[in-house]
């Protein structure tokens, strides 16, 4: 399976708590089947599964952790589990330490959402060469860096460019041609930030919008608040904002509230964290993108167990995204 011919899991794109549980239950059933075919080396004791996430200050990763822990609690007879997150979005050293610690502690499977698509390849390659099964979720590792390190890992995650374009297109439709917008980017070193920027740029071009400015706020709420305040000073005619995640969208709305412009400038985000849903209902945000973070970690564990059972996955195993507006939240 090459990069363009990746397996597609978008049939899991369901909405609401009940349907989310269905996905988790379905994946749980898969692990129950595949765990029964683990190699003899794992028969003596349960496999140890580690999850390495980005910042737990970001509600998206809190949801990811909760989903994984719920899943693990229902599979205590199949594997032991530990989740580790960073204190903020640029705490790369914490991710490196977590992976190295899991290897030292002889974990069998590590599921990782890398904060840096290139820098994280080296510790991940060491884990792979130590015999650990590694599953890359959420943020794709750099292809050339993987090749240079001699590893071939599948990517289990969303179409970040396509998801951002869904949000950007919703904004373009609301503003019409000539609408003046700014973009708040994620960490420049992360592939998902790069892909979301491309998706927003696609919407700007196709919707004939005017891009006034585009800068990074490194996924962080307070940094986004400051950046948006500066944007409004530099560009008082802003009509719309594309934020590459909801944490930054929260910072944007905070800045708009302080300036008395909330609801007057349209805002789109990405992640569908609980905190933005009332803002969308109230008209302070136009839309966000659901990318099913809780299920993403479960899918990573599921496919990792399958790899330990002898299967091999390459390329891109696509997970779903969906545009969320006030209509979906009604």
Regions inferred by a protein language model and the residue ranges of each:
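N-terminal secretory signal peptides
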Residues: 1-36, 40-42
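A residue-level marker of the well-folded mature domains of exported/periplasmic proteins
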Residues: 12-14, 24, 43-330
């Amino acid at each position: 399976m090459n990069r363009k011919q990746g397996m597609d899991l978008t049939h899991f794109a369901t909405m609401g708590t009940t349907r989310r549980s269905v996905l988790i239950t379905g994946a749980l059933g898969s692990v129950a089947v595949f765990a029964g075919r683990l190699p003899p080396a794992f028969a003596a004791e349960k496999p140890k599964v580690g999850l390495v996430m980005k910042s737990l200050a970001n509600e998206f990763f809190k949801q990811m952790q909760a989903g994984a822990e719920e899943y693990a609690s229902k599979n205590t007879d199949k594997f032991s589990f530990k989740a580790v997150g960073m204190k903020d979005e640029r705490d790369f050293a914490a991710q490196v330490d977590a992976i190295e610690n899991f290897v030292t502690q002889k974990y069998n499977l590590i599921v990782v959402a890398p904060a840096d698509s290139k820098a994280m390849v080296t510790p991940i390659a060491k884990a792979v060469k130590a015999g650990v099964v590694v599953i890359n979720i959420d943020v794709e590792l750099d292809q050339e860096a993987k090749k240079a390190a001699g590893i071939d890992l599948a990517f289990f995650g969303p179409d970040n460019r396509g998801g951002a374009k869904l949000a950007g297109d919703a904004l373009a439709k609301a503003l019409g041609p000539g609408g003046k917008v700014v973009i708040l980017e994620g960490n420049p070193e992360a592939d998902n930030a790069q892909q979301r920027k491309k998706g927003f740029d696609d919407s700007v071009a196709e919707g004939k919008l005017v891009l006034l400015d585009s800068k990074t706020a490194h996924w962080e709420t307070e940094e986004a608040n400051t950046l948006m305040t500066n944007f409004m000073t530099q560009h008082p005619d802003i009509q719309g904002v594309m934020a590459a995640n909801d944490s930054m969208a929260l910072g944007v709305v905070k800045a708009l509230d302080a300036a008395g412009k909330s609801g007057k400038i349209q805002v789109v985000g990405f992640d569908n964290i609980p905190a933005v849903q009332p803002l969308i209902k109230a008209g302070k945000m136009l839309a966000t993108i659901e990318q099913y973070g809780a299920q993403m970690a479960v899918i990573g564990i599921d496919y990792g167990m399958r790899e330990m059972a002898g299967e091999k996955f390459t390329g891109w195993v696509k997970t779903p995204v969906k545009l969320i507006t006030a209509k979906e939240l009604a």
